[in-house]
From Swiss-Prot:
Signal peptide: none annotated. Keywords: Cytoplasm. Residues 421-430 have a biased composition (Polar residues). Disruption phenotype: Suppresses slow growth rates of spores and severe nuclear envelope (NE) morphology defects of vps4 mutants. Residues 431-443 have a biased composition (Basic and acidic residues). GO terms for molecular function: membrane grommet activity. The keyword Cytoplasm applies. ESCRT-III-like protein required to recruit the ESCRT-III complex to the nuclear envelope during late anaphase. Plays a role in regulating nuclear envelope (NE) morphology and nuclear integrity, particularly during spindle pole body (SPB) extrusion or insertion through the NE, and perhaps during karyokinesis. The gene is cmp7. One of its GO terms (cellular component) is cytoplasm. This is Charged multivesicular body protein 7. It is found in: Cytoplasm. Belongs to the SNF7 family.
Length: 449
């Protein structure tokens, strides 16, 4: 990314709420001694500075979004009219470099290629070794922090480069609908993603190198060489898709770059034609015939040039489309070949049609024998088993009659009063002789029985 005009990263950090006015004096003071006297206070300050630096870089307030250079320009970006320049930036840089959060560019590239990098919140054998060396005294952590000297060289911000790589990859996958749409030249890559994610339009050589190495060796989402950048598909069907073919991919890259150049030129011609139309209309209104004719001739020349550009682009689109179709057919052929091999293997395991016929014949024989056995069992009925035997029927009728008799007796008793006549009322001798209640008669009969 090219150099930007001076911006006040301090004001940006205050507006974001990263720096609070109550803490500014402490943040801009020399707090290196807190590393020993008050470790918690030191850690609070360096954490705040880290957030301010990384956020300012990502938002374009520093010279790069992903690489830090602790030079005069960097310090000026955080200068304060009231407090001057921060006095502990050297200690802040030394601390986060030792923590592996900001990595020297060459170390970053080497670790990417070796696969040594992990997430900042993760563990690896290398982080364990670094911690062990610090404990054993092989690294004098305190001396570099207390010296408060700004380190030289370029340092990669891991958090920011991972964020940028994620955005670029997501956009590339959104655009990737065919084989050729995954291939970029370096310039086409810059033109495609630059307008979206870096306002300057171009990543410088160092930034491109860091970004591509991270995405290639650490995230495994693309491959690249000095000319071609190729995003990898999510599913690997053909090994060719996961490698750069110098002849095929090189030709595709040339076609894509040519199409992009023609599209850019066509856009410029359209804008120029629109301007000429406006000027021509003004000349016609003013009656300036000579000027109007000049503009009209110029417009016709540009219109023919635009037609040629459109025709050329259509030809390139046709070639690119045919390449995509050929690749699709190749993938389809590979899939069909794999399916045919799988089908052959399954048929071989089945033993051919003769074995299938033998199996089916055995199945039919087994079913026939099973049906014969079932029919034999169903027809079996010994002579001494007779469910309609007269003795059984007579015994059943006797049981029913006995049950009915019991129910009648219970029903009759339910209607008999157990009270004596004296308990209810007193009858005269005449009435007693003349009338006897029906319940009493039934009760007397039952007693006699």
């Amino acid at each position: 990314m090219g150099k930007k005009e001076k911006v006040n990263a301090l004001e940006f950090s205050v507006n974001k709420g990263i720096f609070t006015k109550t803490r500014l004096k402490s943040l801009y003071s020399d707090f290196t001694s807190l590393f020993i006297k008050n470790p918690e206070g030191f850690l609070a300050n360096v954490n705040t500075w880290r957030e301010a630096i990384e956020t300012s870089a990502w938002s374009g307030k520093l010279n790069s979004r992903i690489i830090l250079v602790f030079d005069e320009t960097f310090e000026s970006a955080f200068s304060s009219p009231a407090l001057g320049r921060p006095l502990s930036l050297g200690a802040v840089a030394a601390y986060w470099i030792q923590q592996g959060v900001w990595l020297r560019k060459q170390d970053f590239l080497n670790d990417c290629k070796k696969g040594n990098l992990v997430r900042e919140d993760g563990f690896s054998i290398f982080s364990i070794l670094r911690w062990s060396f610090q404990k054993l005294g092989f690294q004098n952590q305190a001396s570099s922090i207390l010296s408060n000297r700004s380190p030289s060289g370029q340092y990669v911000i891991r958090k920011n480069i991972e964020k940028l790589a994620c955005l670029v990859h997501n956009e590339a996958m959104r655009r990737c609908s065919s084989y050729t749409s995954a291939i970029y030249t370096w310039d086409f890559f810059q033109d495609t993603f630059g307008s979206l994610y870096w306002e300057e339009g171009k990543l410088n050589k160092d930034e491109m190198e860091c970004l591509l190495n991270w995405m290639c060796y650490q995230k495994h989402v693309l491959i690249f060489d000095s000319k071609i950048i190729k995003f990898l598909p999510n599913s690997q069907i053909d090994a060719q898709l996961a490698s750069i073919d110098k002849s095929i991919d090189g030709s595709v890259a040339d076609l894509i770059q040519a199409r992009a150049s023609i599209a850019q030129r066509s856009e410029f011609l359209n804008e120029e034609l629109e301007q000429l139309s406006q000027v021509l209309n003004q000349a016609v209104k003013k009656g300036e015939k000579t000027i109007a004719i000049t503009y009209l001739r110029r417009k016709k020349i540009l219109s023919k040039d635009l037609e040629r550009k459109v025709s050329s682009r259509l030809q390139l689109d046709t070639i690119i489309s045919n390449i995509d179709n050929a690749v699709d057919n190749k993938i389809l052929l590979i899939a069909m070949s794999s399916g045919s091999e799988a089908l052959d293997a399954i048929l071989a395991q089945m033993g051919g049609t003769e074995k299938v016929e033998d199996v089916l014949e055995n199945v039919n024989d087994t079913l026939a024998r099973s049906e014969e056995i079932d029919a034999t069992i169903q027809t079996y009925n010994p002579q001494n088993i007779d469910l309609e035997d007269e003795a059984v029927e007579k015994e059943w009728q006797d049981l029913v009659a006995e049950e009915q008799k019991v129910e009648d007796i219970v029903s009759t008793l339910g209607n008999v009063s157990l009270k004596t006549p004296s308990d209810t009322f007193t009858l005269t001798n005449t009435d007693s002789d003349k009338k006897t209640s029906k319940p009493e008669k039934i009760q007397a009969e039952l007693v006699e029985q």
